[in-house]
Design a protein with these regions (language model features):
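Intrinsically disordered, low-complexity segments enriched in small/polar and acidic residues
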Residues: 6-10, 101, 139
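Surface-exposed loop/turn and secondary-structure junction residues enriched for glycine/proline
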Residues: 5, 18, 38, 93-94, ...
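Active-site-proximal C-terminal subdomain of hydrolase catalytic domains
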Residues: 25, 29, 44, 121-179
Length: 179
């Protein structure tokens, strides 16, 4: 809910069905994959601080007992490339699209996780990185897109994204999900 955390951001800048998609994915992990609910760190409308703390918690868990364990990270929200470097960033609800580099750098997240003991790491990102959102741009850059660079994958790491670099992710209004 970007509009609740930032001035001059209207509700159209929110990511439709992001929370619903995350809840469905959490239930998928629990019911179909058998992951205990206490092993799922579920954040709604996460701020930069909350996302950073969750990443640090995950790193500590990986250091304690990650060697043979699979790690799954699911993110549904805005993504944007930094204009100069074109590096993709995850944009927490309290980060404005004009300050992309204050978000979570996808490259840094992948590097941090790949350096810890782990089995497989799956990053599932339901966000576009074209600079355009699912409804409208977070920064009001209508018609302007930036093609992000692809981050390097770590060893035994999988990255799934809802769209490629120059595509916008869309929503399925009828089924109330992001695509």
């Amino acid at each position: 809910d970007y509009a609740s955390f930032q001035r001059n951001v209207n509700k159209e800048s929110n990511v439709p069905f992001a929370i619903r998609d995350a809840e469905v994915f959490k239930n998928y992990l629990h019911k179909l994959y058998g992951m205990p609910l206490e092993n799922i760190d579920f954040l709604k409308n996460a701020t930069f601080g909350e996302m950073s703390q969750a990443i640090s918690r995950l790193e500590r868990l990986m250091e304690l007992d990650g060697a043979d364990n699979d790690i799954v990270v699911f993110y549904s929200g805005h993504g944007m490339p930094e204009e100069t470097t074109k590096e993709p960033f995850l944009i927490p609800v309290d980060i404005n699209g004009t300050n992309v580099s204050q978000g979570i750098a996808l490259k840094n997240l992948m590097k941090r996780l790949s350096e810890k003991p782990h089995g497989r790491i799956s990053l599932i990102i339901d966000a576009c990185f074209s600079g355009l959102g699912k409804n409208e741009p977070l920064v009001g850059l209508k018609g302007i897109t930036i093609k992000p660079v692809n981050p390097e994958l770590g060893n035994n790491m999988l990255l799934l994204s809802s769209s490629s670099g120059n595509e916008s992710s869309v929503v399925d209004q009828e089924n109330k999900h992001g695509l």
